[in-house]
């Protein structure tokens, strides 16, 4: 089973369990729609009184090592990373992280410079189709070997840190503010990992009493803790292909571009709700 299929099935199962706990009194305003369906993954309106309705936006991951995004179509133009797939929410999140990571930008510039120097001076960006600047497919191999023998390594970023995780939190907070529904004056952003939940942010005049009552509605006897730190890992690299083909059966060389980021390490003080 593909990882993204399993993740969506787990998300649907978590939604169904929470929906059962909350009942008809607290209806869903957003349901699981699959990868790249937008923000939030799902959400419920908690009715604490006639004039006290609070939208709880929930971002869901099925494990503390869940992949948050991946792509094989990014490009680097010398100053920034981008992807032609502008509709993919997950890819845009990943691109944002890459462009806000100094190590990734510096190594992107290093590799682009090496491609210009050791492969072809007409190279203007790193991408999966970049070697096509040399029209003769079999002339690409010695040039790719020249690049491979002279560049330091293929890594662009390999970072695991709270700083990276906190960038994800900041990104979620930004999306949260942009996706508050008109006319809803109180909103809560929560993150759910497997069967545990944390509060990430609030908007409007949400009180401590409100937060306690929200936790009660979810079946918890204690208030949800705030998510203060999140550890994540970012991996970005390129990989030349075709260099190991035998001399008597040569193949055109190509460049693979890869990027992924995932959670790493379980946050503390989560509240089990399902």
Please give the residue ranges for each predicted region.
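Non-Sec secretion/translocation targeting segments of pathogen effectors
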Residues: 1-2, 274
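Catalytic centers of nucleases
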Residues: 3-78
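Catalytic cores of nucleic-acid endonucleases
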Residues: 5, 53, 59-245, 262
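Selective for proline/serine-rich intrinsically disordered segments
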Residues: 25, 30, 38, 238, ...
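Poly-acidic low-complexity segments
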Residues: 41-42, 175, 256
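Charge-dense, extended regions
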Residues: 240-274
């Amino acid at each position: 089973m593909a990882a993204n299929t399993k993740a969506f099935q787990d998300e649907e199962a978590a939604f169904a369990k929470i929906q059962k706990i909350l009942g008809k009194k607290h209806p869903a305003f957003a349901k699981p729609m699959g990868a790249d369906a937008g923000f939030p993954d799902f959400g419920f309106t908690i009715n604490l009184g006639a004039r006290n309705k609070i939208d709880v936006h929930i971002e869901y991951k099925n494990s503390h090592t869940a992949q948050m995004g991946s792509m094989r179509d990014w490009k680097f133009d010398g100053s920034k990373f981008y992807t032609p797939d502008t509709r993919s929410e997950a890819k845009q999140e990943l691109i944002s992280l890459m462009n806000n990571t100094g190590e990734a930008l510096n190594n992107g510039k290093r590799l682009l410079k090496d491609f210009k120097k050791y492969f072809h001076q007409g190279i203007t960006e790193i991408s999966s189709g970049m070697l096509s600047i040399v029209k003769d497919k079999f002339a690409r191999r010695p040039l790719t070997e020249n690049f491979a023998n002279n560049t330091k390594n293929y890594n662009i970023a390999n970072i695991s840190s709270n700083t990276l995780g906190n960038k994800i939190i900041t990104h979620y907070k930004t999306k949260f503010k942009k996706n508050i529904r008109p006319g809803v004056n109180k909103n809560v952003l929560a993150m759910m990992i497997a069967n545990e939940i944390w509060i990430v942010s609030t908007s409007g005049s949400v009180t401590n009493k409100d937060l306690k009552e929200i936790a009660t509605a979810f079946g918890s006897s204690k208030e949800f803790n705030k998510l203060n730190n999140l550890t994540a890992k970012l991996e970005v690299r390129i990989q030349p292909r075709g260099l190991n083909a035998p001399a008597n059966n040569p193949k055109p060389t190509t460049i693979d571009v890869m990027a992924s980021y995932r959670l790493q390490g379980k946050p503390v003080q989560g509240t089990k709700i399902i």
